[in-house]
């Protein structure tokens, strides 16, 4: 009798994706982040669902409903902080996952890579709208500043902003629609993630060497299920430590003040995971230029396959490219730091230099380094 796991239409899909999937035998811990992102997404949907049961998307009651969740709902505080810090863990895993893709040349799977970029944009949009929901000072002013960026679009900008706001300022209509979108988008993300996996399984996984691994594959279960469980336990450990010991470490104190349109906070800034893009936005004195740089800072990932000039796929055997990659990581950390600083003398210049370096590394230095490495191999 044939195993039901291999014959049943539903079980067959699960089997071919997570059990009998042929996987390269040499993939490192950097390949754990896909499953960790799946865990983060499930956690966010579940905690978000329970929060939505008690949250009210009305400007007069939104802030107090979040307070009510933390004070009066059974274990509401832990659900709220798991959701808030779960988002931070989500982005840590996302950036590591994208970094892995850049380092090991996974962008040569163009369909998988492009859907990954769409996923990144969707998750960023979801997180931004979620940050608006508690209706604190930073929620309100963050929403005002970021949505206002669309007014830089020529001709239709101003109308577009008012259309998104549902009025002449960020108000009740804005909060209600942001809640609706914040609720539905994670399910869109789930669907996109499924398509992302579908395309990945068409080609099979990449591996650290960048060489085809068809001759040396092992079943996903038990080898990588065990490996993924270890990664998941470490993720849960870090998240639990964060939630139970310093839940507000990554948040902004201004968000514990109810939204007040008449009082602007001294420093308007988004959550830490958007600070690098915010720093790039601020480094350009022109509004439209800043918005374009902001979008391109993420969209630049889409042209990575075109900028790949190396004869090797990954950076495992390419020391010059490795140095540039880690310079890029340091540059992004610098931009993240700058994004959280006030707009004054040393920070403005550092931000502008870091922004130029970011685009220089990706567009100019890495392709040149790859060509140099190709020539070194001939000697």
From Swiss-Prot:
Swiss-Prot/TrEMBL keywords: Electron transport, Heme, Iron, Membrane, Metal-binding, Mitochondrion, Mitochondrion inner membrane, Respiratory chain, Transmembrane, Transmembrane helix, Transport, Ubiquinone
Binding site for a ubiquinone: 201
Cofactor: how bound: Binds 2 heme b groups non-covalently.
Cofactor(s) the record lists: heme b
Positions contributing to heme b b562 binding: 83, 182
GO biological process: mitochondrial electron transport, ubiquinol to cytochrome c
GO annotations of cellular component type: mitochondrial inner membrane; respiratory chain complex III
Transmembrane domains' residue ranges: 33-53, 77-98, 113-133, 178-198, 226-246, 288-308, 320-340, 347-367
CDD domains from the UniProt entry: cytochrome_b_C, Cytochrome_b_N
PROSITE patterns with a match to the protein in the record: CYTB_CTER (PS51003), CYTB_NTER (PS51002)
Membrane topology category: Multi-pass membrane protein
Binding residues annotated for heme b b566, in chain numbering: 97, 196
Places the protein is found: Mitochondrion inner membrane
Gene Ontology molecular function terms on file: metal ion binding; ubiquinol-cytochrome-c reductase activity
Function: Component of the ubiquinol-cytochrome c reductase complex (complex III or cytochrome b-c1 complex) that is part of the mitochondrial respiratory chain. The b-c1 complex mediates electron transfer from ubiquinol to cytochrome c. Contributes to the generation of a proton gradient across the mitochondrial membrane that is then used for ATP synthesis.
Subunit structure: The cytochrome bc1 complex contains 11 subunits: 3 respiratory subunits (MT-CYB, CYC1 and UQCRFS1), 2 core proteins (UQCRC1 and UQCRC2) and 6 low-molecular weight proteins (UQCRH/QCR6, UQCRB/QCR7, UQCRQ/QCR8, UQCR10/QCR9, UQCR11/QCR10 and a cleavage product of UQCRFS1). This cytochrome bc1 complex then forms a dimer.
Annotated family: Belongs to the cytochrome b family.
Note in the entry: Heme 1 (or BL or b562) is low-potential and absorbs at about 562 nm, and heme 2 (or BH or b566) is high-potential and absorbs at about 566 nm.
Protein's UniProt name: Cytochrome b
Organism annotation: Cystophora cristata (Hooded seal)
């Amino acid at each position: 009798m044939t195993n039901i796991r291999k014959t049943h239409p539903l079980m067959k899909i699960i089997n071919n994706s997570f059990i009998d999937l042929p996987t390269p035998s040499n993939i490192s811990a950097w390949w754990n982040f896909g499953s960790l992102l799946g865990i983060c997404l499930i956690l966010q949907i579940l905690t978000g669902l329970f929060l939505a049961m008690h949250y009210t998307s009305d400007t007069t009651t939104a802030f107090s409903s979040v307070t009510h969740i933390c004070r009066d709902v059974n274990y509401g505080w832990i659900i709220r902080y798991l959701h808030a810090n779960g988002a931070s863990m989500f982005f840590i895993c996302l950036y590591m996952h994208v970094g892995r893709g850049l380092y090991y040349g996974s962008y040569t799977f163009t369909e998988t890579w492009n859907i990954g970029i769409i996923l990144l944009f969707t998750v960023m949009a979801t997180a931004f709208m979620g940050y608006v929901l508690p209706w604190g000072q930073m929620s309100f002013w963050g929403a005002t500043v970021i949505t206002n960026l669309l007014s830089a679009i020529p001709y239709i900008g101003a109308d577009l902003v008012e259309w998104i706001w549902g009025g002449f300022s960020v108000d009740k209509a804005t909060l209600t629609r942001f809640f609706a979108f914040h609720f539905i988008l994670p399910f869109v993300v789930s669907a996109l993630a499924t398509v992302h996996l579908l395309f990945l399984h068409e080609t099979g996984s990449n591996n650290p060497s960048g060489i085809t691994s068809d001759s040396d594959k092992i079943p996903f279960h038990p080898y990588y299920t065990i490996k993924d469980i270890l990664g998941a336990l470490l993720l849960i450990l870090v998240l639990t430590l964060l939630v139970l010991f310093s839940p507000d470490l990554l948040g902004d104190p201004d968000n514990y003040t109810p939204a007040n349109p008449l009082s602007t906070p001294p420093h308007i800034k988004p959550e830490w995971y958007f600070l690098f893009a915010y720093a790039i936005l601020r480094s350009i004195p022109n509004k439209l230029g800043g918005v374009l740089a902001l979008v391109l800072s993420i969209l630049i990932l889409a042209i990575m396959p075109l900028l790949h000039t190396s004869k090797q796929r990954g950076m495992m055997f390419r020391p010059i490219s490795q140095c540039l990659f880690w310079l890029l990581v340091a540059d992004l950390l610098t931009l993240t730091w700058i994004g959280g600083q006030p707009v004054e003398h040393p920070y403005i210049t550092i931000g502008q230099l870091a922004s130029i370096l970011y685009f220089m590394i990706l567009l100019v230095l890495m392709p040149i380094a790859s060509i140099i490495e190709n020539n070194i191999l001939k000697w």
